[in-house]
Amino acid sequence: MSLPNPAELIRQMATDLNAHLSKRGISDPRFIGIRTGGVWVAQALLEALNNPSPLGTLDVSFYRDDFSQNGLHPQVRPSELPFEIEGQHLVLIDDVLMSGRTVRAALNELFDYGRPASVTLVCLLDLNAGELPIRPNVVGATLSLAPNERIKLSGPEPLALELQDLSTAL
């Protein structure tokens, strides 16, 4: 399978996000990336938008509903939100939407900080593997993977996608 170029996806996502926000009458949203890949995508997206806004970051490790099964990620860091959440229009950015559980955890954490006016979900990739009814408002590309395949985003400079075959991993 040939994977898309993240830089090209980001450029198209910037155009699509501007159109989406304009259609909804949103002129000054707050941007939040989900660690780690979502932060990289958010940084690239803000650059493509030529937007100097501060970037918030979320680490949703403690909010995941599979925490008891998978344990705590070894590099948990605090979330950093350099702006108010209450009443704000938010753009929540993740790298890969798979089950929807990471986004659900991010929404739960955001609502602990306040009630936003709206949340626009932006994802570099949607893998159409949702276990929860969560869909991005803006997406770079939609891919279908075999059950033994995963996508890994590396970065931040340059952003690159890698297809991993879990059946050959030791």
Curated annotation (Swiss-Prot):
It catalyses: UMP + diphosphate = 5-phospho-alpha-D-ribose 1-diphosphate + uracil. It comes from the Bacteria. Pfam families: Pribosyltran. Its EC number is 2.4.2.9. A motif (PRPP-binding) lies at residues 90-102. Keywords: Glycosyltransferase, Transcription, Transcription regulation, Transferase. One of its GO terms (biological process) is regulation of DNA-templated transcription. One of its GO terms (molecular function) is uracil phosphoribosyltransferase activity. InterPro entries: PRibTrfase_dom, PRTase-like, PyrR, PyrR_bifunctional. Belongs to the purine/pyrimidine phosphoribosyltransferase family. PyrR subfamily. Regulates the transcription of the pyrimidine nucleotide (pyr) operon in response to exogenous pyrimidines. Also displays a weak uracil phosphoribosyltransferase activity which is not physiologically significant. PANTHER family: BIFUNCTIONAL PROTEIN PYRR. This is Bifunctional protein PyrR. It comes from Pseudomonas syringae pv. tomato (strain ATCC BAA-871 / DC3000).
